[in-house]
């Protein structure tokens, strides 16, 4: 595998399982996939949850979601989360680092654990975000706006569209995978401390096609 292909593989080929179990730091070095580096666990999600929406930006920000966690978890991870790994440039990871621990205690099993940086929750299912999303994030409402027809805890695909050249601001789109499903759009900006802030939010109107 060429170095170019390896780079593309690392940027776009990360699966949910790969992140929850491990990220390969040198796994592309072998010519026939029989040689390569070890795998190192970067993050794990709370009990009942699935990692979805893995998106690595050009600036090294790794967005991912904790989909459908157990509602028995302690807050905040009793609700589905759209979030990002802060405090680390994933495009410039060290050659080796201590892996994220395997969750063993009851407390650890109810958290997002990371090897590097910290998982920041940007928004969660049901958040109204200062009234910008009156029915709540992830909620699909009827065409006349009178009722919620589906309350989703399944944030899936993420896509980040930067509005600044350095990638420190933009729109984060998240598909809420359900029947019917929906899509949220969060306008976000990164502060000097590396943490993200929501400036505006909305659920996109897919009423004409009966949801996503």
PLM ranges: what are they?
Residues 30-212:
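Sequence/structural signature of beta-propeller domains
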Residues 10-20:
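Sec-dependent N-terminal signal peptides
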Residues 1-9:
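N-terminal secretory signal peptides that target proteins for export/translocation
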Residues 13, 29-30:
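Exposed regions on extracellular, virion, or secretory-pathway luminal proteins
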